[in-house]
Amino acid sequence: MFNLPSIKPNFITRDVEAPLSLSERVIYWTIILTPIWWLMGIQPLFYPAVMIGLLSVHFSLDKLIEKPFPIAVWAWLAMSIAMLWTAALGINDMGFNLQVALAATVTFMKSYFMIFACLALPFFARVRVEVITRATAWMTAGFLVTIAIQVAMLFLKIGGGGYTPLLASLLPGDKGSLRVIFAAFSKFLGVPFVRTVLYTPDPPILGICAVLCFLICLSETNKPLRKFALAGAFAALLASSSRSALLCLPLALLMGLCFESGLFRQLSLWLMSVTFIGCSILGLTFKELLAKPMEGFDQVREKAADSSGERALVVQRTLEAWQESPWIGWGVIRGKAHLYEDVYIGLGSFSTYSAVLYLNGIFGFITLISAMVLTLFAVYLPAIRGDNLCKWAFCGLIALYLACNATPLSWMAANLWFFFAWLGAVMFAALPDRVDVSSWEQFSAQK
């Protein structure tokens, strides 16, 4: 029952008909059964547990020596350690608090360390790209069904503001990311439109999730399934009403076309030249140029301007607090930004980059940027040599990094776990086959 239909990928010729490995079965069905985990309210904890558990089961020092991690994978491990270290310092500085310590541990497990586990797993267990692609395609095609059901519930006035699942209600702390929320009407481009977060806790997360699903499903080999999956991804993108995601998708597709035409090697130079010439002609700074598309959305979407202003205020207060402890940050969230009346929001709630500066300081920020850049280059080099999967992985990473400017990666990562699992399989498949030492015993004998 666990065997998928025959998949004949273009980039692998060996073992394509082999039965699924344990890791492939677990990942495949975990992705397929996403609606169940969503209704149970266990997604943010379940996905990290699955990937970290698989890595723990399959970890082998001999395999690590036989095919060591690329430096990009080590960089994500370094980022997770930096996060844990600064959090420990912060908790120690403020006085030990069990609830704060548990929250920091959970955040560590479901963010950067989970990303590391996703990228590292293919080095210890067989995780084929086409298996994750097929599962993601089925999940994304299912978006159409889920959105249709939520629209019907909206018109029938069923569900209301959603609910907190029983399992989620038993856990301590904030239940925001565990709540099941259904669709509601919201004006978008001046027209009442159905808006939903689907299986995620926040519309921008659904937006970037839809973009990444779209890019992954472009390599699905089953044409009918690919068409439904792409339609589902686009429907989810529209339902999210995420301004940044709506800009990210065409940008990602444009970059993919540049790879196809061989222009990408020269694109950065030409793009920079045209951008700054355009800025000088229009009398804009580069920052103002980037803000213009968002202003257009703000003028036509209800409450968008207020939302952007609140985000800017929180980021400003976050950076002001960071300056009091610039090198290692505060470790844990200790302050809130006052929005209006009795409404406050925790510092670091918007923008990955300001949040990392605030929590992990310059040390953590440099580590994060290094991990991002190294991961980008890990897929860029095979992409310019014609690797189609690495091309879309590169485009997906660019879209994700842009989305990180509005939403913390530590908040998004658990809902994007399938992308990181796919990315790890893509990076592993793109590595050259070189084996110098095959076991720890051989390594010890060479000393």
Short names for language-model regions:
Residues 27-37, 52-124, 145, 398-404:
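N-terminal hydrophobic segments of proteins, predominantly signal-anchor/transmembrane helices
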Residues 84-87, 148-158, 257-302, 323:
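A membrane-periplasm/extracellular boundary helix in multi-pass inner-membrane enzymes
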